[in-house]
């Protein structure tokens, strides 16, 4: 269930935490409730939980207008987006054209902007939209070519599957702090936040909307005041450990890509009273090895 549900490839995506999130929902009697992501990005984890029946609704928010435009196109312009996926040529010439559209950032044409974002995500190295080169290089002399991650029918299928859940997917385009403050009193008691801010280190190289130290502190101040249970995931750096020092912190072994075996360590921070699996609390959690017990 946790694999390949999102049409986007996203750096630092947390789909690999699907089993962990499902267990947290179950152990805290939050199943079939609402699930909230202030930083939607690729939405892989949120969609996996929705498709798996672990939550009834997901609230996804992203400040980046290009990312928001893509998700808005899935929910509100499904067939038009599917036709673009099926018919647009995947060539270097088209890559240049789509990059110009994305860089223009015309939010008055969300389908055009959303598709450009999607096109670059599927054709750029590692799915990095900002400042990344095209797969295979402009000369296309690399081992992999521009279209190697652009399986039209599979991607169209994913888009149509998501659209079937449109009435249970709530999309916003707000600053994450503003979003959390506005939604916290509106969601039901059985709700869980999964908060995955831009990395503290190297965030500027991965995200359009990256944070400086003050912004990270602003986020933590808001998170610590939330009424509902939450988990926060971050790169494991001392600065983040310091600003969340009043909450429990655990190191997680994370698989950064489904296709590779590269594993790194990230920090998980949990709200007061949230029950966590012993693999997390005892420091033995490895995402690739963790499963949902019956």
Go through each PLM region and give its residues.
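Non-catalytic surface loops within mature trypsin-like serine protease
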Residues: 65, 122, 271-273
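A structural signal for isolated positions on well-ordered beta-strands in alpha/beta enzyme cores
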Residues: 59, 170, 229-231
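Conserved S-adenosyl-L-methionine
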Residues: 31-93
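SAM-dependent nucleic-acid methyltransferase catalytic core
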Residues: 2-23, 30, 74-194, 198-204, ...
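A short helix-to-beta-strand connector/capping loop
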Residues: 54-56, 164-169, 245
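Class I S-adenosyl-L-methionine
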Residues: 1-54, 174-192, 199-294
């Amino acid at each position: 269930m946790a694999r390949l549900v999102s049409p986007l490839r996203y750096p630092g995506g947390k789909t690999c935490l699907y089993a962990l999130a499902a267990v947290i929902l179950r152990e805290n009697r939050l199943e079939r409730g609402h699930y909230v992501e202030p930083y939607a990005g690729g939405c892989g984890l949120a969609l996996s939980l929705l498709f798996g029946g672990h939550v009834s609704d997901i609230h996804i928010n992203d400040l980046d207008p290009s990312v928001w435009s893509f998700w808005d196109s899935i929910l509100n312009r499904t067939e038009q987006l599917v036709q673009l996926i099926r018919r647009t040529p995947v060539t270097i010439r088209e890559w240049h054209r789509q990059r110009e559209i994305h860089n223009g950032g015309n939010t008055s044409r969300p389908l055009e902007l959303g598709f450009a974002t999607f096109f670059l995500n599927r054709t750029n190295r590692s799915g990095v939209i900002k400042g990344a080169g095209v797969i295979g290089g402009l000369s296309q002399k690399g081992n992999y070519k521009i279209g190697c991650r652009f399986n039209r029918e599979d991607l169209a299928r994913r888009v149509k599957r998501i659209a079937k859940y449109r009435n249970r997917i709530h999309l916003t385009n707000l600053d994450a702090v503003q979003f959390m403050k506005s939604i916290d009193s509106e969601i039901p008691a059985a709700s869980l936040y999964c908060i995955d801010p831009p990395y503290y280190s190297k965030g500027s190289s991965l995200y359009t909307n990256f944070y400086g130290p003050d912004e990270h502190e602003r986020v933590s101040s808001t998170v610590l005041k939330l009424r509902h249970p939450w988990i926060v995931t971050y790169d494991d750096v001392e600065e983040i450990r310091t600003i969340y020092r009043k909450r429990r912190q655990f190191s997680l072994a994370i698989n950064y890509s489904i296709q590779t075996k590269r594993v790194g360590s990230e920090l998980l921070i949990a709200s007061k009273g949230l029950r966590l699996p012993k693999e997390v609390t005892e420091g033995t959690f490895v995402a690739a090895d963790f499963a949902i017990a019956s």
